[in-house]
Amino acid sequence: GVMVGERMEATEVGTPQGGNISPLLANIMLNELDWELEKRKLRFVRYADDCIILVRSQKAAERVMKSITRYIETTLLLKVNRKKSMIGRPTDIKYLGFTFYNQFKAKKYKAKAHEKSVEKVVRKLKQLTSRRWGVSNSVKAQKIAEVLRGWINYFKIGSILTVTRKLDTMLRYRFRMCIWKHWKTPQNKFRNLVKLGIGQKNAAKAACTHGYARICRTETVCYAMSNARLARFGLLSAEEYFVKVSS
């Protein structure tokens, strides 16, 4: 089958979408395209059938796109998907989950995670920190770490430091809500807050406060469940992990 938008459609011929054989066959078929681009002294990047060709002007881009499309279709006998083909500046491109931004001081473009890639990992992390998910918080921390490590190791060649900081802020807030729900009763919340160094007056006030979102933004809860304590519990810091693997 093949995914068309969000709908699965049956297919009788072809290779499975997302299978290991698809990029292998693409590399075999498009090896001659690489030679042709090198012969024309064009700068390009290709992964399987996804290719970017770099030129200096709009006019050159239009000329190259027309001639390379003709080469692919008449010489290689392959069909170019014109809906997915475009001419644009690096900042307009989404390539393998990345986009690019202009670093004016360095006078060059640099890679970063595309906003859709960030939105996708945020949705996944929100699922893993859902208060309705009936697993222990230690399991949640383990699953969060798996997702963060995979995502950061893939995007670490780009500028994602700001993104990792935002992910940490979101995850710590949502994880505090998970812990708060796990404590259940006001009595249990009071006892745990006192154990974590909160004075009895503030602990009693917090324990009787309604609303997860409200209480888990307070100074009392943020102090009791500090970043360091969450880390000791097993919640991975996206920023710290990114700095570690990118240095």
Please give the residue ranges for each predicted region:
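Non-catalytic terminal/accessory segments
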Residues: 1-247
